[in-house]
Design a protein with these regions (language model features):
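Charge-biased low-complexity segments
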Residues: 52-55
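GIY-YIG nuclease catalytic motif and its immediate N-terminal context
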Residues: 1-41, 45, 63-77
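Acidic, glycine-enriched active-site microenvironments
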Residues: 58
Length: 87
């Protein structure tokens, strides 16, 4: 993998709102789907020492509306059945 400059990489804000549905991956495997009004803070919670979730990277899909976020999260969980999501 190569890149010409770090400024060309995707950016995720550390402050402010990045509401949406987020996806945790362990390598190529999708292991968890969640949602929140601030995905950065939610993903940070999954890095706690007592968390059983092991993941190598994450991504998110922006969704501002709370009910739309929750609906999309439920649909995606049912479709993909990530191993760390409870049924």
């Amino acid at each position: 993998m190569t890149f010409d400059h770090p400024s060309n990489l995707p950016k995720i804000p550390l402050a402010g709102s990045c509401s949406g549905v987020y996806f945790l991956y362990n390598g190529d495997e999708l292991v968890y789907i969640g949602q929140g009004w601030n995905c950065v803070l939610r993903v940070a919670e999954h890095t706690r020492k007592d968390s059983d979730k092991v993941f190598t990277h994450w991504s998110f899909f922006p969704v501002e509306n709370e009910s739309e976020r929750k609906d999309l999260e439920l649909q995606l969980r049912a479709q993909h059945k990530p191993k760390f999501n409870r049924v």
